[in-house]
Amino acid sequence: MGPWSRVRVAKCQMLVTCFFILLLGLSVATMVTLTYFGAHFAVIRRASLEKNPYQAVHQWAFSAGLSLVGLLTLGAVLSAAATVREAQGLMAGGFLCFSLAFCAQVQVVFWRLHSPTQVEDAMLDTYDLVYEQAMKGTSHVRRQELAAIQDVFLCCGKKSPFSRLGSTEADLCQGEEAAREDCLQGIRSFLRTHQQVASSLTSIGLALTVSALLFSSFLWFAIRCGCSLDRKGKYTLTPRACGRQPQEPSLLRCSQGGPTHCLHSEAVAIGPRGCSGSLRWLQESDAAPLPLSCHLAAHRALQGRSRGGLSGCPERGLSD
């Protein structure tokens, strides 16, 4: 595979990668929107506690998601435009965006491996605080917030061996609500599904980002070295000076000018001292064609020398 074929394949793969990165950015943006405005996360975040453990984690996740969406989208747009227009600056900008997006995703993966249950613990701690204050009856607002959480997660109460609230818990779940699952289990199952989707998007994002980094770096060097497909077979025409004639081979000029021009060249080649032994064709780069009177004068001079018998020079005719 030649260099032009490799550049062509890299361009096609770069455009396809940018398309999938745009789809990935749209998916991440949808997930971030659902995380921030979704009922399951919003009902926990809106709990009016003095210190909500989940609120700080929620804000951090939302900011990181928006930053990642912006970097992926901007990098895909810049790289696609640079691939089509073969712009070195745009390709460098796309490479920078993909590098930052790669660093952000690596940070997310490291955070997931280092603290895999941080979001889950924050949500469960928030629910525990709302549940305990509602069961103690210190505030009517806490009971409304607890009821809202249970309606959203379709759960009721919690089954914990560390609970010391007595018979008040039995009055919370009655009728159809008693058949619901434990709220702690309901929150864990919901977060498990959400985290699986987030992990899948992060893995796909890392693969696409690495591919985009490789393609963008290769195309950047290709554009810098001038390996451009769109310019293949095109030539740059430099403007010619005013009054300057184009250069032609002397043989072509003789064939176009006829025998008179050839005889003039022969006379010039022989010179005033005699014959040079062989006819030399002249490469006149900048000289303009002489008028017909000059050609006739040279022809007559050549005929006179031939008839007079120049020393050491064979007799030449027009047949040569």
From Swiss-Prot:
The chain crosses the membrane at residues 14-34, 60-80, 90-110, 203-223. Keywords: Membrane, Transmembrane, Transmembrane helix. It is a multi-pass membrane protein. Gene3D superfamilies: Tetraspanin. GO terms for biological process: cell-cell signaling; cytoskeleton organization; defense response to protozoan; integrin-mediated signaling pathway; negative regulation of myeloid dendritic cell activation; negative regulation of T cell proliferation; platelet aggregation; regulation of defense response to virus. The keyword Transmembrane helix applies. InterPro entries: PHEMX_LEL, Tetraspanin/Peripherin, Tetraspanin_EC2_sf. It is found in: Membrane. Belongs to the tetraspanin (TM4SF) family. This is Tetraspanin-32.
